[in-house]
Amino acid sequence: MSKQANNQNLDVNETLAKSEAIIVKYKKQIITAIVAIAVVVGGTFAYIYGYSKPREDKAQELLGIAMQKYIMTQDYEKALKGEGKTLGLEAIASKYGSTDAGNVAKYEAGLCLYQLGKTKEAIKYLEDFSTQGDATISAQALFALANCYAADKQLDKAVDTFKKAAKETNVPARSAEYLFQAGLILENQKKNDEALQVYQQIKADYPLAPICSRQQQGDVVLDAIIDKYIEKLSK
């Protein structure tokens, strides 16, 4: 065996010996640490399967009932408040707010309140809703929140939120529509230069969106909607 090989074996043996020495020296501390990890992991599983998961399942069940009985029939008041033994969205959001289903209940409650014209209450629920990184849901929630801000005359917030929704969605046509809503509000605020910039951005970034496409009516080809708004503010 070569001297280099002997040296390598010595290095390995020395490393192992040091490791064994460390284990012997700190045996009590290491065992304590392992037990602590086991307790944490065990506690986590106990929480998930003994408390968290049952709550999630129950919240999903209650949300499904409320959605089927009231949302589908557009009975927004009962959807919010419930009826008899059926919990409404407000109660589900309050009792199970830490669960995914309880979180969705906040979003649905916000939409129901908006439909009922209770925009300030709707805003509270929609602001409290967590999108949890889902781009589709995030864009829809931001769009709903922007509409609530607009209805509540919080126009600057509405514009900013429409723009955020446009960035969040991965559907170009929706991005164009959300930005268009922001442009309309800016026009309403007499901020024509800013509105024009938004309209020009729509035309440049989303040329295939319906709002940017020319429309045919019989033998007549109409200009794209966005072109009309750009022309109006360019004069």
Which positions does each model-derived feature cover?
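Short solvent-exposed coil/turn linkers within tandem alpha-helical repeat scaffolds
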Residues: 93-102, 116, 130-139, 166-175, ...
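TPR-repeat structural position
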Residues: 75-76, 82, 119, 155, ...
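N-terminal positive-inside, membrane-proximal cytosolic segments immediately preceding the first
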Residues: 1-36
